[in-house]
């Protein structure tokens, strides 16, 4: 089994400007639905942890069931709006983190229904019913088509064009040269020329 202090997580942080419309930490908090396609060599129950940072950090878990090994299936989970803790930070601060739990030791597990928008004390990283994917030699886990939506309903995945995706990614990382060109410099008669390719305003402090 997984040791008491061992964790296997997929980590996804979000900035405040991406989440402030959820109005969490207020009486008007909205639900959040996460939908995705998943394929795992280890069937069973898995869990997703949502941590809401801000004034009074809070966390919640939702479980989903991988029914068959090595087969793609669509899943969705809905987190109720957090109206008591974790007022969203705005702008560039880390506001929310989604953890895809693939394994947690017994000291890091809790019942899904118990740990729902409570403070983050205890370092919980999985639910009691979750599989120990990390303890299976050669195990594989794949997700794609992840979509987060305001409200309790998951809709069809909204595809974006390649230029749109590139522009969004360049907020966090951008090559010093064009995408199709390897980074480097040119030298001519002692003159060294470099290029800084930054078409979009990059975030200076990645969460």
Region locations from a protein language model:
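Extracellular and organelle-lumenal recognition/adhesion modules and their flexible linkers in secreted
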Residues: 1-207
């Amino acid at each position: 089994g997984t040791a008491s202090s061992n964790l296997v997580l997929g980590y996804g942080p979000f900035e405040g400007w991406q989440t402030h419309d959820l109005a969490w930490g207020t009486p008007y908090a909205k639900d959040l639905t996460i939908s995705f396609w998943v394929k795992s060599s280890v069937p069973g129950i898995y869990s997703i942890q949502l941590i809401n940072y801000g004034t009074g950090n809070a966390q919640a878990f939702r479980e989903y069931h991988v029914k068959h090994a090595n087969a793609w299936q669509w899943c969705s989970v809905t987190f109720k709006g957090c109206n008591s803790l974790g007022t969203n930070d705005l702008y560039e601060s880390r506001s929310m983190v989604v953890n895809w739990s693939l394994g947690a030791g017994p000291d890091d597990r809790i019942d899904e229904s118990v740990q729902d928008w409570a403070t983050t004390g205890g370092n919980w990283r999985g639910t009691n019913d979750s599989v120990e994917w990390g303890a299976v030699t050669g195990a594989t886990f794949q997700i794609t088509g992840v979509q987060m939506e305001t409200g309790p309903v998951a809709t069809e995945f909204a595809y974006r064009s390649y230029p749109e995706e590139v522009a969004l990614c360049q907020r966090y990382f951008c090559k010093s040269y064009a995408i199709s060109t390897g980074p480097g410099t040119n030298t001519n008669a002692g003159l060294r020329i470099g290029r800084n390719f930054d078409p979009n305003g990059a975030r200076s402090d990645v969460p």
